[in-house]
C-alpha cells in the first residue's frame, strides 16, 4: 500500500521553502524532495516585491511537479501570521432529545457560529478550543458523547485575500491544480505544543528573520495572534549600522556572540573572503542585547494587548531562526520578561532545529488534512 504523500510550501519572511514528504515511523517524516529560494520577504501584511515572489513560487512549484513526475495535484501553502487574523466565537446547538453527537453535528456547530466579517478575508482553518455538553462536561472531541445540547468555544483563522491573490495564481500558472492555504501559526501550535499543555494554555513565539508572531493557544485552537515587524534580521541590521559593515559579515559576527559566558579576549575575528576583520566583543554584545531588549518590549506589548491573564508558570515557547541560535539569548529574554523561556523545535532526528519548525508543522497538518 502506497503511503500518503503531500507537498507544502512555507512562505517565510526571508525565503520560500517547498517540501514533499510522507509519514515515517515514530512520528517522523520521510522527505522526498526539498527546494528553497530566497526573496525579499514581507512586513505589515505586504510583500516587498510581489513580482519576485511570484517568480520564486513558480520556480519551486516547477521543482515539485518534476519531483512528483507530473502527478502533483494539490499543494498546501502556509500562511504567515502577518496575513491572518483570528476570530473567536461561542456557539450552541440543541437537539429534540438526548442522542449521540455526530461529525455532522460538530460541523453544524461551526457553521452556526461563523459569518465572514469582511470581504477582504477568506476562512482557511477552524478548530475548537473546547466543547461542552448539557451536563457541563468539557471535551476535546464530543463525537460519540450523548447530550441534548452541544456548546463550543470555537476559533476561526482568516487569510488576507491579498496573500491568496499573490500566491495562488503563481502556483496555478506553474501547473498546480489545487492550492490549499493553512495557518502556519495553527500548524506550529498543534505540532510543537503537546496536547496536555494546550488544554491549559500555551504561548508560542515564532521569531523569524523580519517578523515575529505571538500566538496564545488553548485546546486545538488559537485564541490570540499578533505579528510585529521585528526579527533576527533587525539584530543583524543593528550590527551593520554600528560598524558600517556588509550584511553577511554582520550575520557572521552575530553568530559568534555568546551572551552567557565571560569573555577571555577583547575582539571577535571575522573572515570576509581573503580579508580578516576584528570587532570589540563588548560593543558587539551591547548591540545584540539592545536589540533583544527591543524584541522583548514588543513581546510584552503584544501579550498585554491580548487581554489574557496568563499564569506565571506558563513558559514562553520560542521557535524560528531569528534568535534561537544566539547563545545566551534565551536566558536574556527570560530575565527581561521575568518568565521561563523554552526553545522548541521538531522532535525529528536530523531536523530537530527551530528553523525547521514551520515547514515540518505544515507537513504534519497537511498530512492530517489529506
Question: Model-derived features: where do they sit?
Answer:
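Nucleotide/phosphate-binding catalytic cleft detector across ATP-hydrolyzing
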Residues: 1-15, 19-202, 222-223, 260-289, ...
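Acidic-glycine-rich active-site phosphate/pyrophosphate-binding loop
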Residues: 30-31, 207-211, 327-344
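Acidic, glycine-rich loop-and-beta core segments that form the ion-binding/anion-interacting portion
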Residues: 193-261
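Extended hydrophobic-aromatic, low-complexity segments
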Residues: 224-226, 236-239, 309-312, 326-331, ...
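Short, contiguous acidic/charged loop-to-helix segments that flank catalytic cores in large enzymes
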Residues: 286-287, 317-321, 345-353
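A short, acidic, amphipathic alpha-helical segment used as a generic capping/interface helix at domain edges
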Residues: 294-307
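Glycine-rich phosphate-binding/hydrolytic loop that grips phosphoryl groups
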Residues: 342-370
Amino acid at each position: 500500500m502506497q503511503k500518503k504523500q503531500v507537498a507544502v510550501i512555507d512562505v517565510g519572511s526571508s525565503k520560500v521553502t517547498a517540501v514533499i514528504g510522507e509519514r515515517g515511523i515514530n512520528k517522523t517524516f520521510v522527505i522526498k524532495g526539498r527546494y528553497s529560494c530566497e526573496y525579499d520577504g514581507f512586513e505589515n501584511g505586504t510583500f516587498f516585491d510581489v513580482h519576485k515572489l511570484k517568480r520564486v513560487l513558480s520556480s519551486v512549484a516547477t521543482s515539485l511537479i518534476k519531483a512528483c513526475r507530473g502527478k502533483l495535484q494539490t499543494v498546501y501553502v502556509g500562511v504567515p501570521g502577518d496575513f491572518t487574523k483570528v476570530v473567536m466565537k461561542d456557539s450552541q446547538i440543541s437537539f429534540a432529545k438526548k442522542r449521540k453527537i455526530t461529525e455532522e453535528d460538530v460541523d453544524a456547530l461551526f457553521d452556526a457560529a461563523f459569518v465572514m466579517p469582511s470581504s477582504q478575508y477568506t476562512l482557511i482553518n477552524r478548530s475548537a478550543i473546547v466543547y461542552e455538553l448539557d451536563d457541563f462536561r468539557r471535551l476535546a472531541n464530543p463525537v460519540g458523547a450523548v447530550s441534548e445540547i452541544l456548546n463550543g468555544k470555537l476559533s476561526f483563522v482568516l487569510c488576507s485575500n491579498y496573500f491568496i491573490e499573490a500566491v495562488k495564481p503563481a502556483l496555478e500558472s506553474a501547473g498546480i491544480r489545487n492550492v490549499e492555504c493553512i495557518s502556519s501559526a495553527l500548524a506550529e501550535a498543534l505540532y510543537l505544543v503537546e496536547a496536555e499543555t494546550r488544554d491549559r494554555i500555551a504561548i508560542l513565539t515564532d521569531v523569524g528573520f523580519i517578523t515575529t508572531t505571538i500566538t496564545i493557544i488553548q485546546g486545538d485552537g488559537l485564541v490570540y495572534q499578533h505579528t510585529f515587524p521585528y526579527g533576527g534580521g533587525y539584530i543583524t541590521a543593528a550590527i551593520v549600522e554600528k560598524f558600517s559593515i556588509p550584511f553577511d559579515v554582520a550575520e557572521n559576527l552575530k553568530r559568534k556572540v555568546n551572551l552567557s559566558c565571560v569573555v577571555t579576549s577583547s575582539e571577535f575575528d571575522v573572515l570576509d573572503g581573503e580579508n580578516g576583520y576584528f570587532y570589540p566583543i563588548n560593543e558587539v554584545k551591547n548591540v545584540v542585547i539592545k536589540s533583544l531588549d527591543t524584541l522583548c518590549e514588543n513581546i510584552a506589548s503584544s501579550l498585554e494587548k491580548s487581554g489574557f491573564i496568563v499564569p506565571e508558570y506558563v513558559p514562553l515557547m520560542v521557535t524560528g531562526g531569528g534568535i534561537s541560535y544566539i547563545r545566551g539569548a534565551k536566558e536574556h529574554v527570560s530575565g527581561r520578561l521575568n518568565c521561563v523561556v523554552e526553545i522548541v523545535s521538531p522532535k525529528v532526528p536530523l531536523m530537530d532545529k527551530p528553523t525547521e519548525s514551520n515547514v515540518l508543522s505544515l507537513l504534519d497538518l497537511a498530512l492530517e488534512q489529506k
